[in-house]
Amino acid sequence: NTWSREVYAQLLSRLNAEEEAKPLVIGFDIVFSGQAQQEGDDAFAQAAAASGNVAAVSQFVYSEKPERDADGKRYYPVKDVVLPYEALRDAVQVGYSNVAQDSDGTVRRVIPEETWQGTTYAAFPKVVYDLYCERTGTEPNEIITDKYQRTLINYSGRPGDYEAISFIDVLDGKIDSRTFKDSIVLVGAYAPGMQDNFNVPNGRSSQMFGVEIHANILQAFMQNRFSINGNPYLFGAVYGLLCALLHWLFRKKKIWLSAIV
């Protein structure tokens, strides 16, 4: 965007106006890469450092040429990572905002952590979750992943279900700062045309904004609601055993499908 980053410093000032009513965590789903206006950049970084409860996003850049893993599965390797500008990076917790889309373009899974060039990066919702646990003294839940380091997203809400409040209304003082007491505030694009909306399994005909997807993932982390796809061979074996058992029970009790219809 073309705003001076000083507006984000002003937002933090509004949200943290009352110490006893400040949010637990404030997460920016906005890529603050590169230098903009020095004064605004410095103001935002200083406000974030003073807040001590701020997370921001990085973004992986993937190769356009796919490769194959050991199982022959096609994937696009990471070729670079875009980080927040240095002063902000030193003041906040950083997590990547990329979402994993299946071949049909639907976001069903999240990769909580990814390693590139020897460095492990955490996903934005996990960074926010870890910061929340740190600030509340809560032991983080163990995140169950499959062999590709993915976990299925258990969506709690459909597009538009999470409460959205206008950025400008907060800046203008139209929203009582106590509204955000002990909450997690995510700041991100919430309007069509900003190229941050995706197909989701429960979206029906509507797409979901990236910040809403992060909110759903975060809620799943907090509620310990993780799941992964089962082993298809194990599922087949169990299914076959179940069918055989039902067949034996039907014969033993002389129950036939024709008699049930």
Spans of features found by a protein language model:
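Non-transmembrane functional regions of envelope-associated proteins
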Residues: 1-146, 180-257
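Small-residue-enriched core segments of transmembrane alpha-helices in multipass membrane transport
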Residues: 260-261
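Substrate-access "cap/lid" subdomains that shape
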Residues: 137-176
